[in-house]
From Swiss-Prot:
Name this protein carries in UniProt: Phosphatidate cytidylyltransferase, mitochondrial
Assigned GO CC terms: mitochondrial inner membrane; mitochondrion
Pathway the protein takes part in: Phospholipid metabolism; CDP-diacylglycerol biosynthesis; CDP-diacylglycerol from sn-glycerol 3-phosphate: step 3/3
Source species of the chain: Bos taurus (Bovine)
Family designation: Belongs to the TAM41 family.
GO molecular function term, any single one: phosphatidate cytidylyltransferase activity
Keywords from the UniProt entry: Lipid biosynthesis, Lipid metabolism, Magnesium, Membrane, Mitochondrion, Mitochondrion inner membrane, Nucleotidyltransferase, Phospholipid biosynthesis, Phospholipid metabolism, Transferase, Transit peptide
Lineage, top ranks: Eukaryota, Metazoa, Chordata, Craniata, Vertebrata
Length: 335
């Protein structure tokens, strides 16, 4: 695993982090405010900075004392309710958005360590796990062995899922585009509110960062011939090879594939279904449907939850910014 530590931007990010309680298992920054993206947001020098903080109780109670004004009306219900909303609704993450901090506009999501580990290993929501399949800047990380192991496994699972949706031979860009798109499969925001060229806009300017993130996994994988200098890869597309890959997919994705393929009344076990899928010429399409079955409901629940966690006014402003970004992308493509 090669999650990227801070470089020149480290001091600015750490200054922002100093405004929050210190008890963080992991803090990372992501998005167009951190990594250059092609497309309509490429010229935004002061793009909003996106953060995710991985925490344990009683983080919200401490943050409410320091940053009361960051929260919506839910703050009057207290930290216990906020934590319950965070863990039990949407994708397990609580976002405060459109916050001014150290002269920058920021958005930060808060997720519990245990919920993140579950998502990284099993892809229950593929929400924050999906963010961590793309290049991010690690601002802080403790020595939690279980979390570090789960971060590594999430990257390996992303590679395996992408392999199943690719042909026998493909390029690095093909692979990284599939990986970057995993957590957008079925995401309704890609229809309303997001620039539809978003995945390519993420990958093309950041090929070196993707290589840094996935290079060692590809070099060590027995499933692929990786010609790094040529930027090309070859994988085993035999039913046996695909079955091996399907059996190592995260549990929730396996269950969704089983649900899609299992006829009513059959009640086959997951392994039997995956063996059938391995022999199916449309194996990659089935995997894609399984991903969409995870992402679609979790993205919708999380966006609905955002109305309450951000408050109605901020939700309207934030949605307007997203729609403006989508419009700029459409104008750019048609001009």
């Amino acid at each position: 695993m090669a999650l990227q530590a801070l470089q020149s931007s480290g001091v600015a990010f750490r200054k922002i982090l100093s405004h929050f309680p210190e008890e963080l298992s992991l803090a990372f920054a992501y998005g167009s405010g951190v990594y250059r993206q092609a497309g309509p947001s490429s010229d935004q020098k002061n793009a909003m900075l996106d953060f995710v903080f991985t925490v344990d109780d009683p983080w919200h109670s401490k943050n409410l004392k320091r940053n009361w004004n960051h929260y919506s009306f839910l703050k009057v219900l207290g930290p216990r309710i906020i934590t319950a909303v965070q863990n039990n609704y949407g994708a397990g993450v609580y976002y405060n958005t459109l916050i001014t901090c150290d002269g920058r506009l920021i958005k930060y999501g808060v997720i519990s360590t245990s919920v993140l580990i579950e998502d990284l290993l099993n892809w229950n929501n593929l929400y924050i796990a999906g963010r961590l399949q793309k290049p991010v800047k690690i601002v802080a990380m403790n020595e939690d062995v279980a979390l570090r192991s789960a971060l590594d496994q999430n990257l390996k699972s992303a590679v395996t899922a992408a392999f199943l949706m690719l042909p026998e031979s493909f390029s690095e860009e093909d692979l990284f585009t599939e990986i970057a798109g995993l957590s957008y499969s079925g995401d309704f925001r890609m229809v309303v509110g997001e620039d539809k060229a978003k995945v390519l806009n993420i990958v093309k300017p950041n090929m070196a960062h993707f290589r840094e993130l996935y290079g060692s996994i590809l070099q060590e994988s027995p499933q692929v011939v990786y010609k790094a200098q040529q930027g090309s890869l070859e994988i085993d597309k035999s039913p046996e090879g695909q079955f091996t890959q399907l059996m190592t997919l995260p549990k929730t994705l396996q269950q969704q594939i089983n649900h899609i393929m299992d006829p009513p009344g059959k009640n086959r076990d997951v392994e039997e279904t995956l063996l059938q899928v391995a022999h199916d010429p449309d194996c990659g399409d089935v995997v894609r449907l399984g991903l969409a079955a995870i992402v679609r409901p979790s993205s919708m629940r999380q966006s609905t939850k955002g109305i309450f966690t951000a408050g109605l006014k901020k939700s309207v402003v934030y949605s307007s910014l997203k729609l403006h970004k989508m419009w700029k992308g459409w104008v750019r493509k048609t001009s």
